[in-house]
Amino acid sequence: MEFLKSFTTILFVMFLAMSALETVPMVRAQQCLDNLSNMQVCAPLVLPGAVNPAPNSNCCIALQATNKDCICNALRAATTFTTTCNLPSLDCGITI
């Protein structure tokens, strides 16, 4: 259950990270933002209390269409936000 809460937080921060990236060309940043926005169909699956946390076909299609670099870059950026915001570091039990 804690993993789902953490994953939901990561997804939210991913969207924020994509809008904050300044080093990526604008077209690429917009593509990543669009890709990650399409991943919203997966959000109900990772929220605390999700009845069936297995991905459905819509989630799988969105994940397949998403550039993997966009996901990884967003997660990397999100991990730096806690330091900048003077918050405890994220401990999600995943290694990126």
Swiss-Prot record:
Tissues expressing this chain: Tapetum of anthers.
Cellular localization per UniProt: Secreted
Principal cellular location given in the protein's record: secreted
Protein name stated in the entry: Tapetum-specific protein A9
Any GO CC annotation of this UniProt entry: extracellular region
Signal peptide: 1-29
Keyword field: Disulfide bond, Secreted, Signal
Source organism superkingdom: Eukaryota
Covalent S-S links between cysteines: 32-70, 42-59, 60-85, 72-92
Similarity section: Belongs to the A9/FIL1 family.
